[in-house]
Amino acid sequence: MAVVSKTTMIGELLQIDQNVAPLLLNIGMHCLGCPSSQMETIEEAAMVHGINPDALVDEINDFLAKDQA
């Protein structure tokens, strides 16, 4: 099972599991296809969108654990 951190790049996250995209879109991260977002960390993206990065990482890791089980 993959585990991500605040320093994981959005592009890397989407390579780990593309099924995480709807989770990100539902919280307002609509720029997943933007070239610049691919080089942004989860923490940077969370901060731009006013989201707690630690909570987001926990939510993503919970999702990955279930999706990749």
Predicted regions and their residues:
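Domain-level signature for proteins that mediate thiol-based redox and metal-cofactor handling
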Residues: 1-69
